[in-house]
Amino acid sequence: MPEADALVVWVSSDHLSEAVAQYGDATGGGLRAAVASGAFTGKACDVAVFPCVRADWHVSHVVCVGAGPAGDVDAERVRRLAAVGAHACRRQRAPRVAWVDAALGALHDAQRLDLLAEGIALANFDGGFYKTRDERTPFLTDITVLTSAPDADTALRRGSIVGESANAARVLINEPGNYLWPERLMEAAGTLASVPGITVEVLGPQRLKDLGMGMLLGVGQGSAHPPHMLVARYTPEGVTGGPVLGLVGKGVTFDTGGISLKPADGMDRMKDDMGGGATVTAALRTLALLKAPVRALAIVPAAENMPGSRALKPGDVLKSAAGLTVEINNTDAEGRLILGDALWYARQLGATHLVDVATLTGACIVALGKVTTGLFGTPLPWVDAIRAAAARGGEKVWPLPLFDDYKDGLKSDIADIVNSAGRPGGAITAALFLKEFAGTGPWAHLDIAGTVWAEDAKPWMPRGATGAVVRTLVELGHHPLP
């Protein structure tokens, strides 16, 4: 047993007697008493912390994390249990942790350890980086996983990389609008260039104008900070052909709604409107660090949607890089505009399979709440591949329709299409708008409006950015693209 401030053990609700036999004496009878009284039942995500009286263990505390019924444990449960245990250690101010690995559910060893490491990494995060008082809970600094599983180091490294990449996205999403604007987002995402296999290019306003990206430029014209676009490419060593996975992420660094101004209540949350951009750059970073065998690129169109004197107005008409003209009937339907130009450009750069990620519509929250990400796409095998990737990663996505009947709402009297079809079916019509610019070939849209942010703290997740769908995209890039 390594010297540690805390020993973390998982306790299934249907194996309480075994846990008491193994750890009852080491906890000075504390675990035995807690189980006997019903104070600790092994319910999923329950935590009980006891002083350790076994001097030969060199451990200060034993942290018991309830895992629920052993047969009910899935990928998301493991990640949550790991985060709950890590948060408990941080609250205990126990930076050195020894973690006892144990079989859970039907997950194989590598998957379980991968998720364990990711959950710990996600919990070892604090969004209060502008606090000046010493109120932050100490981070975990030394973690030893006690396991006999083969190739454990590989699985633990993979999970740590995924978790740390998701945390990088969470940092950007949590940033206030006065600290993060398009140029700053380019600088932050530009650090991808330090990752082996990734090259980065930043397109400024003049280059965007040369490319005819009237929608992106139009959205940002009311801001003092002009639009930019990040283009990052990952090429695996020795790979010269095959499909190219294109990841496109919405990068509205702050969204007031523009002239179609949002209500003041809740507008502060609109700093998270670049969550899609943060997500795709985090995913690309992870694919490169894990040496995924697929060529990939990440494109982030970045703009600030402000109601300045030069701002886009309802009734204006913009010309897209794809050549389509768009009548603006709602300046708060801006994300689809910048994504449209970016999707077109991704195809020009050779993307064969596209996924865009965006905090796109409140309508998706109405449809699916804040638990499930909305999924749209075509053809069906591509949608199924993304659903399978989400399932492997323990994330929830749900497909919504793209019936042509909904297109009537996008008709314009003076342009090719309008940018908003109104409230009914709003998530669907927004996705249909994007489809106009996605070209031929597989395309999917992930609407993370409800899942990008945790409004209420959970035992496994503090309030703030969540890092949603990073793992889904990473899983997608590690399997053959259909």
Segments the model singles out, each with a brief description of its role:
Residues 1-244, 248-251:
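Short amphipathic alpha-helical segment within the helicase RecA-like ATPase core
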Residues 41, 186-482:
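A generic structural signal for tightly packed, nonpolar segments enriched in small/aliphatic residues
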